[in-house]
């Protein structure tokens, strides 16, 4: 089977030849692996056989990016959302948030007027080169993007945003719908230009270690209409939807299923997202991607990661509906040798 066939099969809750494989190592992790033997001339996704190719566009207000300060350890930059962040030079951690452009409701309209669909939001040469290569290799090609709470953190401090979601949900809903509409129009434009996607991969972190960052009721007031609108568009174009949402998001899974979500990712283990429990509870109502603990990957005892993969694959792969991925992304404390072992085990226990 090709990757395209394999993933389509899994998302239909049918059993392919083996579990599809995809993952997300950090840039700092890849740099470490190159020092430990990953060939410089082979992209990591090619070396390990990742099966999903993402093609996106710029969904931001496109403010200029400026470097304000650079040291041997840190870099302070503005972003295309108008924010200012401080990062380690290797971008190996979540950035420190220094400033955000929206502090009050009056700050939103000047940003909103910049969020319009435009052909220049897509790097067409790169997009078509990526698309044609991926299509020739039989990959599963998705349109990527994201709107909602996670994206809005690029405009507002998290605490201010969370308070606004409760005190003025209609305003937050307007911000989310504005971004969702931009995504819909841009996908429409890309499809009309010849990018025939196999699916969609959207990002919106809504959880943390202990649960949702906001209540299911707040999700329904602020997010649900926008999510359903874009999901409906995707389904009309035969594009199953994978949603990346970190943390524990169990409480809104029924809402996500109701509006048409096909697959939930990444299933953070430390947040209580156990793929075995989720698979047993939702069966063929939802597919799952991820759930393999990166802490087990970094454990010096090789039996730990083997048991992690064996025990979870045993349940998750039955009847299809599962794609391998780490339970978030691969940090730099996982060695090249350890990760090669991970993929060996995925192939061993992922056979049908």
Where are these regions (language model features)?
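A contiguous, low-structure linker/loop signature
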Residues: 64-117, 137-138
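Compositionally biased, low-structure terminal segments
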Residues: 48-49, 64, 89, 129, ...
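Surface-exposed flexible segments
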Residues: 34-42, 88, 92-93, 338
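Segments that shape or occlude catalytic/ligand-binding pockets
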Residues: 32-66
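Short active-site-adjacent helix-start/loop capping segments
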Residues: 29-32, 62-65, 85-87, 151-152
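Active-site loop segments of alpha/beta catalytic cores
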Residues: 1-36, 76-78, 105, 109-352
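Short, solvent-exposed loop/edge-beta patches enriched in aromatic
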Residues: 15, 46-53, 69-71, 137
């Amino acid at each position: 089977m090709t990757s395209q066939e394999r993933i389509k099969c899994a998302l239909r809750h049918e059993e392919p030849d083996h579990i599809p494989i995809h993952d997300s190592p950090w840039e700092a992790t890849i740099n470490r692996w190159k020092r430990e033997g990953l060939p410089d001339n082979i992209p990591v996704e090619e070396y390990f056989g990742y099966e999903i190719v993402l093609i996106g566009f710029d969904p931001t207000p496109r403010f200029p990016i400026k470097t304000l300060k650079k040291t041997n350890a840190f870099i302070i930059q503005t972003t295309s959302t108008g924010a200012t962040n401080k990062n380690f030079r290797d971008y190996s951690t979540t950035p420190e948030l220094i400033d955000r452009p929206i502090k009050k409701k009056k700050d939103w309209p000047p940003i909103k007027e910049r969020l319009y669909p435009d052909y220049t939001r897509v790097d067409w040469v790169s997009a078509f080169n990526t698309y044609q290569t991926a299509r020739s290799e039989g990959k599963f090609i998705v349109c990527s993007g994201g709107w909602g709470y996670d994206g809005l953190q690029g405009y507002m401090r998290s605490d201010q945003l969370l308070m606004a979601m409760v005190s003025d949900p209609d305003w937050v809903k307007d911000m989310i719908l504005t971004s969702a509409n931009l995504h819909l129009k841009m996908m429409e434009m890309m499809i009309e230009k010849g990018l025939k996607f196999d699916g969609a991969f959207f990002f919106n972190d809504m959880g943390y270690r202990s649960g949702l960052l906001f209540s299911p009721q707040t999700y329904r007031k602020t997010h649900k209409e926008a999510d359903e609108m874009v999901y409906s568009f995707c389904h009309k174009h035969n594009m199953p939807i994978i949603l990346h949402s970190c943390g524990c998001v169990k409480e809104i899974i029924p809402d996500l299923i109701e509006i048409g979500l096909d697959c939930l990712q990444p299933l953070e283990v430390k947040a209580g997202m156990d793929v075995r429990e989720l698979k047993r509870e939702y069966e063929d109502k939802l597919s799952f991607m991820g759930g393999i603990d990166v802490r087990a990957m970094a454990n010096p005892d090789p039996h730990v990661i083997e048991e992690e993969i064996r025990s979870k694959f045993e349940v998750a792969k039955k009847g299809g509906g599962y794609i391998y991925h780490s339970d978030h992304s691969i940090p730099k404390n996982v060695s090249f040798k350890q990760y090669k072992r991970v993929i060996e085990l995925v192939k061993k226990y992922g056979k049908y």
